[in-house]
Structure formats: C-alpha cells, structure tokens
From Swiss-Prot:
Catalytic site: K285 (proton donor)
Enzyme Commission designation: 1.2.7.-
The protein's name in its UniProt record: Ketoisovalerate reductase BEA2
Catalytic activity: (R)-2-hydroxy-3-methylbutanoate + NADP(+) = 3-methyl-2-oxobutanoate + NADPH + H(+)
Native source organism of the sequence: Gibberella intermedia
Keywords, alphabetical: NADP, Oxidoreductase
Temperature-dependence annotation: Optimum temperature is 35 degrees Celsius.
Protein family per UniProt: Belongs to the ketopantoate reductase family.
InterPro entries (UniProt xref): 6-PGluconate_DH-like_C_sf, 6PGD_dom2, Ketopantoate_reductase, KPA_reductase, KPR_N
GO cellular component entries: mitochondrion
Effect of pH on activity: Optimum pH is 7.5.
Described purpose of this protein according to its UniProt entry: Ketoisovalerate reductase; part of the gene cluster that mediates the biosynthesis of beauvericin (BEA), a non-ribosomal cyclic hexadepsipeptide that shows antibiotic, antifungal, insecticidal, and cancer cell antiproliferative and antihaptotactic activity. Ketoisovalerate reductase BEA2 catalyzes the NADPH-specific reduction of ketoisovaleric acid to hydroxyisovalerate, a precursor for beauvericin biosynthesis.
C-alpha cells in the first residue's frame, strides 16, 4: 500500500519516530495538598444505593486494576456495574482535564440514575487520575502504573479520540495488555490499516490485544460524573487485533481475561462475539450514526419522532431514504473490497458448522444483502414496501 492510500491519521503516525511519552498520574492530592480523609456523602434513602466499598480490593497492582479512560456516559455505565461484579477489581477513572480532579473531590462520586428501577447508584470508591506529560509541582509524584504495564484498559472517549489515547499510552502497553474501545464508531485498527499501525508502533512479540465494544444502551449526561441510564439495552464485545502467543499457541482471543470480565459484568448484558461479528455490528451501528443521529441533532428531536410519517412524498422520509442509500453503498463497497477478505473469512469460518467447509463468496453475498438499503430500512422500523420516490 502506497503512502497516498494511507488515511491522514495513519500517515501522521508512520512519520512520527519519537519515543512514547512518559506520563505522570496526577491525583486530587496534586491539586489540593491536604484533603479531608472523610467526605460527607449525605443521608441515603430507599431510592439511593451507595457502593463505596464495592471497588475495595486487597491488591492495587496494575495487573489487577481496570483503567477507564474517558469516564463519560458509557464509561460511567460500565464503571458503576463493574464495581458490582461478583469478582470486582479496583478501578481507576482517567479524566481528560485537570479541573475534573477538583470536581471529583466536591461531588458524591460516580452517579448513575436507573430509570427502570428508579434508583440512583452512587459510588465514590474509585481512584481518579489525570495523565499528563507535566510533572506535578507539589504533592505525590507518580508515573502511570508506576512505570509498569497496564493490563486492563477500557477506552470510552469519543470515537475520534480513541486511537489517539491508546497511542499516547503505548509506553505502558504490551503483550500483557488488553485494550477495549467502547465508542460509537468503527475501530481504526481493522485491516488493512490496523496491522500496519501496530507493526510500526510496537516491537514484535509485545503487541497488546485490542477489542471493540458496541454499546446500545441509551445513556445521557446529567452533569459531571452523573449519567441517566434512560434506555437499557445490550452490548457486544469482540477482538479486533491479537497476536498469537508462542508460549501458548492454543490460546484464543475469547480466552482474554478482560474480555471475559466485561462479558460477565452484571446489568449491562454484554455478549462476547467473534472478531467478524463485532466488525459487522460496528458497521450496523455506523448506520445509526450516519443516517439517524445527525438528523436528531439537526432537528433537535428524539429518534422516534423521525418515524412519525410514512408518506412517500414526506421530505424527511426522502432525506432518510437518501442517507440510507448512501450509507448502504459505502458499507457494501467495504464488504466487497479485497482488504476485508481476512475479516470476512474469519467470520465465515466462525459461522460454519463443524466438519463443513465455508464458502467465503456465499457469506460475502449474504453480507451484501444484510447491508442493502431495504434491509437497513426495515431494521430502523420502516416499511420495506413503501415507495421511496428516489
């Protein structure tokens, strides 16, 4: 692949030969030299549940700790319920602004209002850090993971910032690391660009496992460290890139500890799937992001309001149909492209019955139908036989 075929983000990283930066882990102690040991959490009632001890574990080693980078709505959802895991691990929330350290001190912790149960889950039992190249001028000086490797990393920033965050911390990533991207976007590490990026940024034999998590839960922000779980749904997690371990050649990405830990986290209904299936699920989520979400933002309405009119001459219906045709064409082009051969082959092998051979061309044809405009429209709740007028 020539440099002209590289996307801009990859070209910029390929020409970057600088070593990965050393990062300092600031804590609230670096903002306020002396903090009160106890923080008044107020009085609780029947609609509030406090989980201050849920994250307390004997070990604080980095190989046991979960690091949630970008604790926004999705990060807060998973942090809340990871803390309620039967085998809960210590959790560090990595914020993107220094000011959030002070806000953490002043707030009651991570709050998640569950609309279904009518409960407000509050948890102050997390460690909160801000990672920066700037050494703190006062307070304890601590490098990220004490200069060791991070094992369990959950990146829930906005999609466009996900890989940049992972690249910034690559000094602390290696073969022992499992990195999960949980965002409303397609992971950049799929072939053909992912393997090229990884071979450029990591030494051979010391590559992390990278996975993607597609989240369908409806979660809205209600303030710093506070979210509303408005629409419970489900989620899927699967591997994007993993390197075979010469010491354990029989190991499969489904054996990854962190993937299994997320899949067994209560109340978020996260299903573990194959690499090919998570690729397809990300593409399906892309349909919502490309055709529906921009319209709800532009028209300042809820998703359901887009489907109140089914008339063939309705201007909004025509716009949505046009967007779906364009989105379908792009995704079908990707499915049919030679660079997608490896992931489609992996998906075909996973879907084939034991003892039978898989037909990649047949699987590719079915996937082309899966992402056709009529099927996409049906999945969005529209009538397939409606005249589009296009």
């Amino acid at each position: 692949m020539t440099s002209q075929e590289h996307p801009n983000w990859l070209t910029a990283l390929l020409v970057d030969t600088r070593p990965p930066p050393k990062l300092f882990a600031w804590s609230p102690a670096n903002i306020q030299p002396k903090l009160d040991e106890g923080i008044d959490m107020g009085s609780s009632n029947s609609d509030e549940e406090y989980d201050n001890d849920a994250c307390v574990c004997q070990s604080t080693d980095s190989d046991q700790r979960i690091y949630i980078i970008g604790p926004g709505n999705i990060g807060r959802l998973y942090a809340t319920h990871m803390a309620r895991h039967p085998n809960a691990l210590p959790i560090t929330l990595v914020v993107h602004r220094k000011e959030l350290l002070s806000q953490w001190v002043a707030c009651e912790g991570v709050g998640l209002a569950d609309i279904t149960s009518g409960k407000l889950f509050l948890n102050k039992g997390f460690t909160v850090e801000w990672w920066t190249e700037t050494r703190p001028p006062y307070g304890p000086v601590k490098e990220v993971a004490d200069g060791k490797k991070l094992h369990n990393v959950f990146i829930s920033t906005k999609a466009e910032a996900g890989l940049a965050e992972a690249d910034r911390i690559r000094r602390y990533l290696g073969r022992c690391s499992s990195v999960v991207f949980a965002q409303n976007g397609v992971c950049k590490l799929w072939p053909p660009h992912g393997p090229l990026y990884i071979s450029h940024r990591y030494p051979s034999g010391d590559t992390p496992t990278f996975s993607a998590c597609v989240v369908s839960h409806g979660v809205a922000s209600a303030g710093p460290f506070l979210s509303v779980h408005a629409a419970p749904a489900d989620a899927y997690i699967g591997p994007v890139f993993w390197a075979s371990d010469p010491e354990s050649p029989w190991r499969h990405p489904s054996d990854d500890f962190f993937i299994r830990h997320i899949a067994t986290t209560p109340h978020v209904n996260t299903k573990q799937v194959s690499s090919g299936e998570i690729w397809l699920l990300q593409l399906e989520k892309l349909v919502m992001n490309a055709a529906i979400n921009p319209l709800t933002a532009l028209l300042r309405c809820k998703t359901g309001e887009l489907f109140t009119s089914y008339g063939s001459d309705d201007p909004l219906a025509l716009v949505i149909d046009k967007l779906l045709w364009q989105t379908s064409a792009v995704i079908q082009g990707l499915v049919d492209h030679k660079t997608s051969h490896s992931v489609i082959t992996s998906y075909a092998e996973h879907m084939s019955q034991p003892g039978t051979s898989c037909s990649v061309p047949k699987v590719r044809k079915k996937l082309m139908e899966r992402f056709s405009q009529p099927i996409l429209k049906a999945k969005l709740g529209w009538e397939e036989d409606r005249d589009t007028g296009l």
